[in-house]
Every structure is written in structure tokens, then in C-alpha cells.
Amino acid sequence: MARIAGVNIPDNKHAVISLTYIFGIGRTRSRAICAATGVAETAKIGSLSDDVLDELRGEVAKYTVEGDLRREVSMSIKRLMDLGCNRGIRHRRSLPVRGQRTKTNARTRKGPRKPIRK
């Protein structure tokens, strides 16, 4: 297994699919990375040479991925909560942020039903 950005990449899968194991890299960005390094999308990671893997590592390093991206996302949510704006308040109360209805549904975000105390 090759390690790119601190993630073990499976050897037996195509390069495009394998790169998506890195947090912050989806299919589109994975295709762009393969095109920039000249790696065929259908090439298996296990069959690539160390030089090509180093090129892939360098190309991935240009993007914000893994721990840095997770930190960036959590800090932006924390910033919204500190501001006290509507989105921050919704995050703080564990409610849907983007205008979905909450009279019914939203069970994933709100958690299991709580019984009404009498």
C-alpha cells in the first residue's frame, strides 16, 4: 500500500478511485491530479513506479487535504457559532442549518425522539 498525504492508498484499485480515499479529494479532483501528473486513470497504484508516486504526492500536496482540511472546516463552524449568526445558532442547537423543515423529519440531526414529560 502506498502512502499519500498520510493515508494508505489501496494498490489494487484504479488511480482515480484510490486517490478518493484521501479526505478532500473526490472524483473530479482525482481526475485533475491524474491528468496533471500524466498517470492513466485506469492505472493501478501498485503498478506505478516510486517516481510517479512522488509526482502524485507533490500534486496532492498543492491542495488542502486530510487534517488541515478537517481543522479548517471545524474552525469555520466554530467561527459561525462564536459570531452568533443564524447558521451558528443552528449548529449550536444541532438543528438543520440550510432551511430544512423540522416539524417532521430532521431526525438524523436532532437525534432520537425524546418522550414528553408530564
From Swiss-Prot:
The gene is rpsM. Part of the 30S ribosomal subunit. Forms a loose heterodimer with protein S19. Forms two bridges to the 50S subunit in the 70S ribosome. NCBIfam families: uS13_bact. Keywords: Ribonucleoprotein, Ribosomal protein, RNA-binding, rRNA-binding, tRNA-binding. Located at the top of the head of the 30S subunit, it contacts several helices of the 16S rRNA. In the 70S ribosome it contacts the 23S rRNA (bridge B1a) and protein L5 of the 50S subunit (bridge B1b), connecting the 2 subunits; these bridges are implicated in subunit movement. Contacts the tRNAs in the A and P-sites. HAMAP family: Ribosomal_uS13. Residues 91-118 are annotated as: Disordered. GO terms for cellular component: cytosol; small ribosomal subunit. GO terms for biological process: translation. This is Small ribosomal subunit protein uS13. GO terms for molecular function: rRNA binding; structural constituent of ribosome; tRNA binding. Signal peptide: none annotated. It comes from Marinomonas sp. (strain MWYL1). Belongs to the universal ribosomal protein uS13 family.
